[in-house]
């Protein structure tokens, strides 16, 4: 089922997500919904908080840019945690489904190790590098209440200030309208 994206300005994006204690049908359905939503929105990664669910859950589907015949690297990570990273960073342009049309360069580690649970509840360790490592860091940040704009340098934030303010104001106005409709319905 398609889910609605949470957009910048919504306070949920700044909250730390809760650890998933039990992998049940509800979590498995959530994973499927996240993949469906991510594909529809043409993303390569999605954290549960981006659809309003404050659970430590991330899905990714990353193409192999060197071999278009290869299938995408597709993975659901439950309770993901970066347990190691190298010291080398690379700055590449990032965007985010929760920040429509806003992009900028973000420095990320080029190699990481991620501990997570798979769909069956088995603990896994993933060695990731380059683009996959970048996508994972971006999505795991979301589970910790961190958005890619929090990783920007101050000069980058100043450059994007107007666009971010407009996006936040539009989101806040939309949330207020929904809340007002809910209050009217319940009175």
UniProtKB/Swiss-Prot annotation:
Keywords for the protein's UniProt record, in alphabetical order: Hydrolase, Iron, Metal-binding, Protein biosynthesis
GO molecular function: metal ion binding; peptide deformylase activity
Protein residues bound to Fe cation: 96, 138, 142
Enzyme Commission no: 3.5.1.88
UniProt xrefs under InterPro entries: Peptide_deformylase, Peptide_deformylase_sf
Cofactor comment text: Binds 1 Fe(2+) ion.
The protein's enzyme class: hydrolase
Any one GO biological process: co-translational protein modification
Domain of life where this protein originates: Bacteria
Residue pairs linked by disulfide bridges in the UniProt entry: none
Location of the active site: 139
Alphabetical list of NCBIfam families matching this protein: pept_deformyl (TIGR00079), PRK00150.1-3 (NF001159)
Entry's family note: Belongs to the polypeptide deformylase family.
Function: Removes the formyl group from the N-terminal Met of newly synthesized proteins. Requires at least a dipeptide for an efficient rate of reaction. N-terminal L-methionine is a prerequisite for activity but the enzyme has broad specificity at other positions.
This protein's name: Peptide deformylase
Annotated organism of origin: Brachyspira hyodysenteriae (strain ATCC 49526 / WA1)
